[in-house]
A protein has these predicted regions:
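Hydrophobic faces of well-ordered beta-strands that scaffold small-molecule active sites
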Residues: 1-6, 29-31, 56-60, 87-91, ...
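Active-site mouth loops of central-metabolism enzymes
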Residues: 1-12, 62-69, 143-154, 210-213, ...
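N-terminal beta1-alpha1-beta2 module of alpha/beta enzyme domains
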Residues: 1-59, 147
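Short, acidic/polar
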Residues: 10-21, 75, 153-161, 289-298
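Conserved, mostly hydrophobic/aromatic
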Residues: 25, 48, 79, 118, ...
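Glycine-rich, proline-tolerant flexible connector loops at the mouths of alpha/beta enzymes
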Residues: 28-51, 63, 95-98, 174-177, ...
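Alpha-helix-loop-beta-strand connector modules within alpha/beta enzyme cores
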Residues: 42-62, 66, 121, 325-338
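An alpha-helical appendage that flanks or caps ligand/catalytic pockets
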Residues: 104-138, 180-301
Length: 338
C-alpha cells in the first residue's frame, strides 16, 4: 500500500518537508494547488524533487480552470523530467482555488474534456485547437515516462470519468468503509455501463484525515479543520448522498449550506464546529495505532491501494502535527510494508 503525505506548498520549508517525508518512508508527497492561499504548487514541487531521490510528487489537487490543459500538461511533464519519473498529476473539479476567484467547480462534462485533452498532450499527441495543430513538441526530445493522471472524486459522475479516462482514481469520501466500498462499486459499474474496452482498471486511492494519538478526542480536534474541508464536498449542492449514513445527513446539510469560505481549513469555523466527535470518528482514521491499523486494513481489503494522509496542519498545531506525522510513520507504515 502506498502512503502519501498531504501538504501545503510553502517555499520556506518545502525541501525540509519533502526530505522528511522520504526519510520517514512515505511513498509520495502531494501539495495543494490553491493560488490565493499558498505558494505556487509547481515551483514548490520542483524544489521538492531536487531535495529527494525516490519520493513521488504531484499536486493534490489541481483543477481544469486556472490553467489551460497545455499549461498543466507542460508543468507536470517538466516535473516528471526534473524528478526523473516521479510525477503524478492529481486533479479534481476545483474548490478553494476556484471560489477564491469567484468560480464554482467545473461541470462533469468540462472536467472530462479537460482530462481527455491532458491525456493527448501527455502522450505526445496533437489536437486541433481553434484550427491550430497543438502539441507539446518539446516532449519529443525527452525520455519521459508518461505521467499518470489521478482523478480526485466524490460523486458517481466524476468517479465514472476517472474510471474511463485515467490511470488512478482517489476517493474524497472519508474513511467510512461502506462509503468507500460504494465508490469502488461505482468504478466497476462505470466500466460495465460504458460498453468500452479499457486496457486496465485504474488503481484506487483515498484522501483520508488521519491522526495517530493515544487520546482519541484530542485526535478528533487535530483533524477537525481537514475533515471540515473534505466533508463539505459531500455537502455541496447537487452532491449524491444516496450512499451516506443517515445519521450524518444533517451534518452534511450544514456543511453544504453554512460553509465559511473565509475560514476555509480552520477548526474554529462555524461549519467545522457543527461536526460531532462521532461524525469525525466515522469520517477519519483517529486514535491509538491498533485502532488506526484495524480501520486501514478494512479499507485496504475493499481494494484501496493508496492513501493520501491528511494529518494535522503544522501551521495550526505546531509540534503536535509533527508528532502525528512521525507516529504514523513509526506505528502504521511498517505494518503495511512487504
Amino acid at each position: 500500500m502506498e502512503f502519501w503525505h498531504f501538504g501545503v506548498p510553502s517555499i520556506k520549508n518545502i525541501e525540509v518537508m519533502a526530505k522528511k517525508c522520504e526519510d520517514l518512508d512515505f511513498n509520495g508527497l502531494t501539495l495543494t494547488d490553491s493560488q490565493n492561499l499558498s505558494n505556487e504548487t509547481y515551483i514548490a514541487l520542483t524544489l521538492a524533487a531536487r531535495a529527494t531521490t525516490k519520493l513521488m510528487l504531484g499536486p493534490g489537487v489541481t483543477n481544469p480552470l486556472t490553467r489551460h490543459a497545455a499549461v498543466t500538461a507542460s508543468a507536470i511533464a517538466t516535473l516528471q523530467e526534473v524528478s526523473e519519473g516521479r510525477a503524478i498529476l492529481g486533479i479534481g473539479r476545483g474548490d478553494s482555488s476556484l471560489f477564491n476567484i469567484g468560480h464554482k467547480p467545473v461541470p462533469p462534462r468540462v472536467f472530462q474534456t479537460y482530462i481527455e485533452t491532458l491525456q493527448i498532450y501527455l502522450n505526445g499527441g496533437s489536437l486541433k485547437a481553434n484550427g491550430y495543430e497543438s502539441q507539446l513538441k518539446w516532449l519529443e526530445n525527452t525520455n519521459n515516462k508518461k505521467v499518470p493522471i489521478d482523478v480526485a472524486a466524490t460523486g458517481p459522475k466524476i468517479i465514472g470519468v476517472g474510471a474511463m479516462t485515467s490511470e488512478r482514481v482517489s476517493f474524497a469520501l472519508g474513511a467510512d468503509v461502506d462509503r468507500l466500498a460504494w465508490g469502488v462499486s461505482q468504478i466497476e459499474q462505470s466500466i460495465l455501463d460504458s460498453n468500452q474496452m479499457i486496457s486496465s482498471k485504474p488503481s484506487l486511492g483515498a484522501y483520508l484525515n488521519i491522526c495517530v494519538h493515544d487520546d482519541i478526542e484530542r485526535a478528533a480536534e487535530l483533524v477537525r479543520p481537514g475533515v471540515g474541508i473534505f466533508a463539505h464536498f459531500t455537502g455541496m449542492s447537487g452532491a449524491n448522498r444516496d450512499h451516506v449514513n443517515q445519521a450524518d445527513q444533517s451534518t452534511f446539510d450544514k456543511l453544504g449550506s453554512n460553509y465559511d469560505k473565509h475560514r476555509h481549513g480552520r477548526g474554529d469555523a462555524t461549519h467545522a464546529q457543527e461536526m460531532s466527535f462521532e461524525f469525525i470518528d466515522r469520517f477519519s482514521v483517529i486514535g491509538p495505532p491498533e485502532v488506526c491499523i484495524k480501520k486501514i486494513n478494512a479499507i485496504k481489503a475493499i481494494g484501496i491501494e493508496r492513501i493520501s494522509v491528511i494529518g494535522p496542519r503544522p501551521d495550526h498545531f505546531g509540534a503536535e502535527a509533527d508528532q502525528a506525522q512521525e507516529r504514523f510513520a513509526a506505528d502504521i507504515i511498517p505494518t503495511f510494508r512487504g
